């Protein structure tokens, strides 16, 4: 099991925060597996910084490749949100 820290744009983050969204479409560049944890940090692209809100989610299912016509190099991750918290706002990626 791995933990992946990921940026999430405000509209997508809010949909997860309010339980409207339970899947992520991502580049398949991290070797995602069922059981992995995602640390999703809300990113404000206009200010080029994190907002301070973070969700932790577990990957419960994934789809790669031609199954369901997922483009090569991408993955669909079904997620279960485990919790949310406020972290240091305004921090910039390293």
Locate predicted features.
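Short coil-to-beta-strand transition motifs
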Residues: 49-58
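A structural micro-motif recognizing beta-strand termini
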Residues: 26-29, 80
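Short, basic/aromatic beta-hairpin or loop at an interaction surface
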Residues: 1-22
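Glycine- and charge-enriched low-complexity intrinsically disordered segments
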Residues: 50, 63-94
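Short, charged beta-turn/beta-strand-edge "cap" motif at the junction between a beta-strand
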Residues: 43-48
């Amino acid at each position: 099991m791995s933990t992946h820290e990921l940026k999430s744009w405000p509209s997508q983050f809010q949909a997860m925060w309010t339980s409207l969204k339970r899947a992520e479409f991502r580049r398949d560049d991290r070797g995602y597996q069922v059981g992995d944890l995602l640390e999703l940090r809300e990113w404000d692209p206009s200010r080029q910084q994190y907002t301070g809100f973070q969700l932790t989610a577990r990957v419960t299912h994934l789809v790669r490749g031609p199954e369901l016509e997922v483009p090569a190099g991408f993955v669909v991750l079904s997620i279960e949100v485990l919790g949310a918290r406020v972290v240091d706002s305004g921090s910039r990626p390293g």
